[in-house]
């Protein structure tokens, strides 16, 4: 029921000894400052957390079902990694690890608590360097205490189910992936016009039960679990095709990763 952890100060002392650093006061006891010689280019960054997306679903990694033709095509023309592992089995684990560089801790949701913890991570570093940080999710912003946690830890704007038309909500997890992506584009266009670099998170949901296949998408698979992967891939394709038409596209880095691995 409970994790057996060593005392916090002992863990900090051990890590400082191993890393040979004293940390940075007010940021982290094991942080180090990195100074770049070159002037930062300040490209926009769009990071897409793909719900439960795993390598075993892609043709490149051995799947014969042809569920992810677009992701497979991106893999061949992008900077890609064969041994990349998402953290934990819950979305909050993957977000926490990816954005704030902490490992997932079993049986704990680091985003919840009576007092919202303050962390240094990718969002806060980018914000300190002049970025506008936006987060788009399909469901209610209070889910997993995301709204309070993200606003406390570097995000300026959060868009969630309460911002979307009620007729676009399809289940308890909110709107479809392709609607989320369509909704985000005009907002990103406005931010680009302000000539301030932006860091944007898009958190998808489609590949999470209960699965909802929109009427306007026609999958070739017969199993619902496969159809939803086809839809998720198609929705990403639609977003990237539209993003490619925008003036900010060439100055933007797109990062796609699975938020976590679904329990098998």
Residue ranges: model-predicted function:
Residues 1-264:
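Soluble catalytic regions of membrane-associated enzymes that act on cell-envelope
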């Amino acid at each position: 029921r409970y994790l057996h952890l060593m005392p916090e100060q002992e863990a900090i002392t051990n890590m400082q000894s191993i890393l040979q650093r004293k940390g940075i006061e007010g940021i982290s006891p094991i942080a180090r400052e990195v100074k770049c010689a070159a002037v930062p280019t300040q490209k926009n960054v769009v990071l897409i957390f793909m719900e439960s997306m795993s390598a075993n679903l892609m043709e490149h990694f051995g799947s014969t079902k042809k569920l992810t033709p677009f992701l497979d095509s991106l893999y061949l023309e992008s900077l890609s990694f064969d041994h990349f592992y998402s953290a934990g089995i819950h979305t909050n684990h993957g977000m926490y690890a990816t954005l704030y560089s902490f490992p997932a801790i079993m049986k704990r949701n680091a985003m919840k608590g009576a007092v919202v913890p303050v962390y240094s991570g990718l969002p806060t570093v980018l914000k300190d360097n002049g970025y506008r940080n936006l987060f788009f999710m399909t469901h209610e912003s209070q889910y997993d205490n995301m709204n309070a946690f993200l606003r406390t830890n570097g995000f300026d704007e959060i868009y969630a189910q309460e911002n979307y038309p009620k007729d676009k909500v399809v289940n308890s997890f909110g709107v479809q992936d392709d609607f989320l992506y369509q909704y985000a584009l005009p907002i990103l266009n406005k931010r680009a016009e302000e000539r301030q670099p932006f860091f944007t998170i898009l958190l998808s949901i489609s590949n999470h039960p209960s699965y909802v296949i929109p009427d306007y998408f026609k999958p070739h698979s017969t199993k619902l679990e496969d159809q939803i992967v086809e839809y998720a891939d198609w929705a990403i394709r639609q977003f990237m095709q539209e993003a490619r038409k925008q003036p900010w596209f060439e100055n933007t880095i797109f990062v796609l990763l699975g938020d976590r691995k679904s329990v098998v």
